[in-house]
Structures are given as structure tokens and as C-alpha cells.
């Protein structure tokens, strides 16, 4: 059934929003995996765990915003299978932050690709939505995680377990 509210919403944009929604859910799922790993009794880096838990919730909220947007534009939300995270074990905080940085860059590139598609299909509403809700936040997250990686290396990771402990106790907590 065709939506009565649909206007100037290209089917390619609708499909791309559904793919973006799925990617945000995958990111949330991956961050949940990281949270569970760092919260384990044999890892016990609770502030790092909380950082990933917060990011999981944030990515889930992003997915929900895409659902709401899809419905507002008269599109149809089509959920797809969410891929399992690439790992179950995340090693140390440095490895996990490097994986998180790559994930954020992947999400950012997908957002930029969606913005280009919206521009090509002359959809100023979708462009505005992406610019106001996502693009700046992605750049901030990439910078924040990049800074964490720099500081983790400065603390001697992956060789220095004390550096990882200090990072958990001070760096992640202070940046919240």
C-alpha cells in the first residue's frame, strides 16, 4: 500500500535508509559485545565496559531515529538480519578502541554516501536530517576514540597492563 504522506522520497533513498538503519543496529550489537567482554570478571575494566554500553545505546537510538524518519517520509521500514560482530573476544582496550574507530569510520562513510544519494535525488529533507542528526556527532566520536587510542599507546599498551588499568580508572570516566 502506498503511503499518503510520501512526497519527493525516492525509492533509492528509502532503501538506503533501511540499510543505514541496519548498520546502526549492527554497530549497537558490536558495542554490546564489547561491553559484555570488558565487564567480564577476568577483564574487569568497568569504565571501558560502560563506555561501550553507552555507545551501544547511542547506536540503537540512531537506528530508532531512522525508523521514525522512514515512517515520517512515507517510506516503509524493512528490517534485515543483523550480522554477528566479527569477534567475541576483544583482547585489550587498545584493540577494542581500534575496532571501534574503524566501525565509526564505516558508519560515517555510509552516512556520507547516503547524503550524496539524497543530494543526487534532490532530497533536501533527507540531507537536512543527516546534517542535523548525525554528521557532526560522527566526527566528534571519531576524534574522541582516536584520542583514546593515542593515550592508550602513550600508556604503553598493549604491553603495559597498568596503563590499561589507569586508562580505565581515569581517561574514559573523565571524557563522559
Swiss-Prot record:
Amino acids binding Fe cation 2: 59, 104, 138, 141
Any one annotated GO CC term: cytoplasm
Listed EC numbers: 1.16.3.1
Keywords (A to Z) from UniProt: Iron, Iron storage, Metal-binding, Oxidoreductase
Binding site for Fe cation 1: 24, 59, 62
The keyword Iron appears for this protein: yes
Disulfide bridges in this chain: none
GO biological process: intracellular iron ion homeostasis; iron ion transport
Gene Ontology MF term list: ferric iron binding; ferrous iron binding; ferroxidase activity
Reaction(s) catalysed by this chain's protein: 4 Fe(2+) + O2 + 4 H(+) = 4 Fe(3+) + 2 H2O
Every Ferritin-like diiron domain range: 7-156
Uppermost EC category: oxidoreductase
One Pfam family from the record: Ferritin
Subunit field text: Oligomer of 24 subunits. The functional molecule is roughly spherical and contains a central cavity into which the polymeric mineral iron core is deposited.
Further comment: There are three types of ferritin subunits in amphibia: L, M and H chains. M and H chains are fast mineralizing; the L chain is very slow mineralizing.
Stated role: Stores iron in a soluble, non-toxic, readily available form. Important for iron homeostasis. Has ferroxidase activity. Iron is taken up in the ferrous form and deposited as ferric hydroxides after oxidation.
PANTHER family per record: FERRITIN
Stated family: Belongs to the ferritin family.
Designated name of the protein: Ferritin, middle subunit
Amino acid at each position: 500500500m502506498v503511503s499518503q504522506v510520501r512526497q519527493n522520497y525516492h525509492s533509492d533513498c528509502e532503501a538506503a535508509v533501511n540499510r543505514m538503519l541496519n548498520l546502526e543496529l549492527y554497530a549497537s550489537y558490536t558495542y554490546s559485545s564489547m561491553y559484555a567482554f570488558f565487564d567480564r570478571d577476568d577483564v574487569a575494566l568497568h569504565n571501558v565496559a560502560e563506555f561501550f554500553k553507552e555507545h551501544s545505546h547511542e547506536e540503537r537510538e540512531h537506528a530508532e531515529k531512522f525508523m521514525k524518519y522512514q515512517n515520517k517520509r512515507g517510506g516503509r521500514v524493512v528490517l534485515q538480519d543483523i550480522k554477528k560482530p566479527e569477534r567475541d573476544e576483544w583482547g585489550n582496550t587498545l584493540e577494542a578502541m581500534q575496532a571501534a574507530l574503524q566501525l565509526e569510520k564505516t558508519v560515517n562513510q555510509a552516512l556520507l554516501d547516503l547524503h550524496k544519494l539524497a543530494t543526487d535525488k534532490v532530497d533536501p529533507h533527507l540531507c537536512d536530517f543527516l546534517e542535523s542528526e548525525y554528521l557532526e556527532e560522527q566526527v566528534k566520536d571519531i576524534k574522541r576514540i582516536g584520542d583514546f587510542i593515542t593515550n592508550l599507546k602513550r600508556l604503553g599498551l598493549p604491553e603495559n597492563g597498568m596503563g590499561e588499568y589507569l586508562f580505565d580508572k581515569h581517561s574514559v570516566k573523565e571524557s563522559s
